[in-house]
Amino acid sequence: MHFGIFHTALNIYPDVFYEMLNGDFVDVFLSEGEVEDQASAEMLKAIHEKGKKLYVSFFFWAYKHVYREMMVDVGSEYSARVVLRDGWQETVDAKIAFLRASGHWEAVEGFYIDEPLLNGITLEDFRTVTAYLRERCPDKRIFCCFSIAGVAPDVWTANNVKPITPEAGQYLTDVAFDMYHKFDEKYAYITSEMKRRLGNREDLRIWQVPCTMNYRGDKDEQHCLDHLNGCYELLKKEKNPGGLMCCTFYTCPAEVEAL
């Protein structure tokens, strides 16, 4: 079972990255920068030397926003449309070739994407790109964190988002969803719905995403501890757990250190 924290990449918070890299509780990281950037290359090298793992974000390798409006998490309707970039296959091939040539390919656990359906990616385009990644890198994992709309629209949805299907999610190996409200019975239900909509595949690794931030400005230490412990207890019930990937979007590093 892995443990990681979003938004702790070298190019975002170098001090926090090295603290976690040199510690003994974080063993997986997420890189959202360009793989060719110096910071991203240094991050991959350092992770490899420590024997830890990295997921690399692939959203902008293949997709681009046509329009993007208000964010849901500040209380307004989210509206987006995303299309495939021209020449996206060549871009994906170039990124993979760079990572392979780095000498640190072994440290790349796989590829990551965040809330693709809420962001406006169609089910067809999602399947197309993940299938291409699987074809090019059959030994690597493909990890997706869905919005609630993408897996349990009866709990929450927006902008006519079409939830995931077994066909569209066929090439995924690791999945999660993110919700940062008080931990309660809905989390088990949403997890069950996510698995059901993906065909109840036994090979899928299931992750949980604990809230370790002052989400919407009204979360405190107790909220975060309850959320973390709840996610962990839920994850321990899984036959094929992936791990915990804590989210720190608003508060890393100062308030996270305080927590």
Predicted ranges, named:
Residues 1-259:
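Glycan-processing catalytic domains of CAZymes
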